[in-house]
Amino acid sequence: MIQKPIVQAIEQTLAAHLRSRTEWDEPPVVFTIQQSGPDSVVLVHIPVPRVVWDAHGHPPTVVANLAATVHQLPRHPDGTHLLVHQRAGKLLGVGFRYEAYTLAASSDAPAVQEAVRRRKAGGSVPRFREIVGRREERCITAVDLDGGRYMVTATRIEQAKSEATEPRTKYLAFSDPKRDTLTGNVVDATIRLLNAIKPLPIRDDPGGHR
């Protein structure tokens, strides 16, 4: 079971990573979350060529396809996946960083207000990026081996500048009744990737060899 100090370390490390970004229009990134010390974690980048992200255009599908591919790769004798750097520490989870557009219900922009109203009524709306007044965000969605879910976001303050707000973090444990409020294709793809690379138990063969 992942203890509270490690959960807090994951939150802090994800927020620090998002805070370190200074440019926009970056390609998405996926990484493992590994325990580097008693109360510390490290993020280890899983390389995905930019051409892969650009060719598909829908990052969650790229992550889901990556999960399906790496699931078939061989493993180390101890059951750990080849993508997990053993020297970085025990695997705790997986994270997925990306950029997205969102609509703020408190926005004064007429186009945003209309889009929010139509969404609440169950109607269709244009793509968020096409709506005048929408907000641009850097995001990290992460999941851990205990079923916990993490969401970290930072909003661009002005379109003409690169500064963003201080990252906001949200953690929902597996037992949290509000856990289902953090769902969607991004969460599903991240879970698939974690399931594809998480450690597998070592099986004894009939001859007594591992």
Region annotations inferred by a language model:
Residues 39-42, 104-105, 149-150:
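Eukaryotic short linear interaction motifs
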Residues 14-18, 79-81, 124-127:
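Short alpha-helical segments and helix-capping/turn motifs at coil-helix boundaries
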Residues 1-9, 61, 177, 181, ...:
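Alpha-helix boundary/N-cap detector
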Residues 27-30, 93, 136-139:
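Short, surface-exposed beta-edge/turn micro-motifs
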Residues 16-65:
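N-terminal interaction modules that seed assembly of large macromolecular complexes
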Residues 1-24:
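Short N-terminal edge-element motif at the start of the domain
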Residues 58-114:
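Short HxH-centered metal-ligating active-site micro-motif
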Residues 107-210:
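Glycine-rich, aromatic-bearing surface loops/beta-hairpins
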